[in-house]
């Protein structure tokens, strides 16, 4: 059996590992010639994701803070995988934040940011991955698809 001192050391090591876990991020930006309201309408229309999104070809669920969405994700090899994300935050016509994964193993935090611009809307899409799984995960294909997705 572990002593109290050993247990405290293990807990501190675990907490430190979680704080300094590996991280990778991808980002894509595009100026869309439409007002933020129109872009927002497209992003929040869960029934029509397949019409414009080459990664998430199906989406169902509750698009609101605290809601869960089931996403049919097209993988790099063309196969489909379903993942569940939680909508962490939404600010109408400005931002949608979602997250998924198992803390410590691999988590993904996804953000759509809409910024009004003279010519329309600057859409910034970011995804940050954290956890030990990052050491074995290359999100380069996600960044490539993100650039395609932004052509909404």
Where are these regions (language model features)?
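A conserved amphipathic terminal alpha-helix motif
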Residues: 2-8, 126-152
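Hydrophobic ligand-binding cavity/cleft-lining segments
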Residues: 2-64
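Glycine-rich portal/gate segments that line the openings of hydrophobic small-molecule binding cavities
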Residues: 5, 31, 50-51, 60-109, ...
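Solvent-exposed, acidic/flexible segments
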Residues: 32, 36, 42, 80, ...
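Non-transmembrane interaction and regulatory regions of membrane-associated proteins
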Residues: 55-57, 96, 108, 121, ...
């Amino acid at each position: 059996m572990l002593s109290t001192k050993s247990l405290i050391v293990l807990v501190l090591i675990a907490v430190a590992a979680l704080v300094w876990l590996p991280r990778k991020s991808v980002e894509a930006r595009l100026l869309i010639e439409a007002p933020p309201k129109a872009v927002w309408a497209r992003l929040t229309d869960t029934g029509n994701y397949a019409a414009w999104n080459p990664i998430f070809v199906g989406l169902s669920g509750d698009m609101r803070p605290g809601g869960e969405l089931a996403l049919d994700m097209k993988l790099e090899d063309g196969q489909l995988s379903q993942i569940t994300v939680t909508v962490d935050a939404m600010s109408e016509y400005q931002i949608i934040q979602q997250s998924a994964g198992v803390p410590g193993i691999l988590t993904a935090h996804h953000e759509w940011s809409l910024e009004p611009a003279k010519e329309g809307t600057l859409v910034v899409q970011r995804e940050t991955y954290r956890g030990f799984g990052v050491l074995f995960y290359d999100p380069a294909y996600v960044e490539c698809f993100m650039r395609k997705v932004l052509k909404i």
